[in-house]
């Protein structure tokens, strides 16, 4: 497993009173291997290499131990693939890695529920270096399109406290993080909620690749640009671990990356390689950037009502203003 490491970059607009806050983080990009022992071994090697490189936190891809199931509809009950959050194999595996390597380890799983339809939650978790489960966040937005039929497997995460900020207690200090998942990364509202909540870093564990209905359309550049934009407009570091390789109908394209609040890529993985990205972040750069460009201070929440209004669509599926706000000349086609 190759390791690609980025030392800390200087701030582009250092505040006069700034105090640097370095923290080293890592992600592991992997492919799903049918043999569960070999699959775990590649993750174990990646986490160990991250620890050897000085990482205090390592982030793993979506549905860490399993094949991506949603390229097709379930043939039986969806919960045949689900597991207990507290006592299932994923958290047990993360506990083992975290205590052995003495660092915080993030992962993701298909969390079982008692829902009659068999759907569970797509849940991100964090285990600290003592093996304690210190954070969990359920995926809020669920994709519904060809090759990513997740609505047949996962329920939407609860709206109440949907975007919690977790304080990780590291040797370098406290690190406030958010743990949304994959499809959440396309929604600017999610990054903004975390930014307003005081997060300094978001991890989006991801499973993204080809589009079965449009095999020649490479969405990787759009995916990266979207998340880089969220980083800039919310003053956030972003850690985005993806998988690679062919699984069913999807060719996952890797390209995992880490980005800072200035939009600088601190590392990007190849499309077709299991590897580790390591980067030392200066958390104080969030304060630097948001002091120069005070997005939160100059917001206009009183003008944002339409953002939380139900969506009305015309017969082409394009959103139009809600009936209360629409003038006669804006009526749906």
Segment roles from a protein language model:
Residues 31, 61, 140, 205, ...:
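Conserved residues at the C-terminal ends of beta-strands
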